[in-house]
């Protein structure tokens, strides 16, 4: 794929680009603020990856809770002008690889609008399954619906990982 960018850990220098992409995807009133992204970026129990080629084109944020066996995808955003290039797929795969490295994490979950057919197709193709419907999850109209599906994926251990416990 000649259009592949570099996927890397996000840093504070990416805040403006991340915030701008969020605004492009969700509009002013529905977006996370720069302050919220700064918190998510620097929070000890989170992962933020960006995909970059001539600037940041997309990002994913995954949250971890101490002692929990489930990681949560908080958001996966790709610039509307860059969609259809596999950026979301690559970000999702990279995030899953990072999550597999966390001891005790066995599953990854997310919520997605019941009306967001593109995202639903992406997640289904990646092996996520719907486990429930959350009514009025968003509290506002999001892709033509206020409801969300909860989706989960069971994660296999990282390649070469043994089952021996110390």
Language-model segments: which ranges?
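Acetyl-CoA-dependent GNAT
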Residues: 5, 9-83, 89-102, 136, ...
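Conserved catalytic-core motifs of GNAT/GCN5-like acyltransferases
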Residues: 109-111, 124, 129-144, 150
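Short amphipathic helical patch at the helix-1/turn junction of helix-turn-helix
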Residues: 78, 113-114
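Residues at secondary-structure transition points
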Residues: 35, 86, 114, 141-142, ...
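Conserved GNAT acetyl-CoA-binding A-motif
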Residues: 99-111
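Short, conserved catalytic or adaptor-binding loops enriched in Gly and charged residues
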Residues: 1-2
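Short glycine/proline-centered loop/turn elements that form peptide/ligand docking sites
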Residues: 92, 116-119, 136-142
């Amino acid at each position: 794929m000649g259009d592949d960018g570099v996927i890397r850990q996000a840093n504070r220098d990416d805040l403006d680009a991340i915030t701008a992409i969020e605004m492009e995807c969700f509009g002013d009133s529905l977006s996370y603020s720069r302050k919220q992204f700064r918190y998510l970026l620097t929070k000890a129990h989170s992962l933020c990856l960006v995909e970059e080629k001539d600037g940041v084109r997309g990002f994913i944020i995954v949250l971890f809770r101490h002692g929990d066996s489930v990681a949560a995808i908080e958001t996966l955003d790709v610039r509307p002008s860059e969609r259809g290039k596999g950026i979301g797929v690559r970000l999702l795969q990279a995030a899953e690889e990072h999550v597999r490295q966390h001891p005790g994490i066995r599953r990854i979950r997310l919520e997605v609008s019941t009306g967001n057919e593109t995202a639903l197709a992406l997640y289904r193709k990646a092996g996520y399954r719907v486990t429930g419907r959350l009514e009025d999850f968003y509290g506002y109209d999001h892709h033509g619906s206020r409801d969300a599906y909860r989706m989960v994926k069971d994660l296999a251990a990282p390649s070469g990982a043994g089952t021996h416990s110390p």
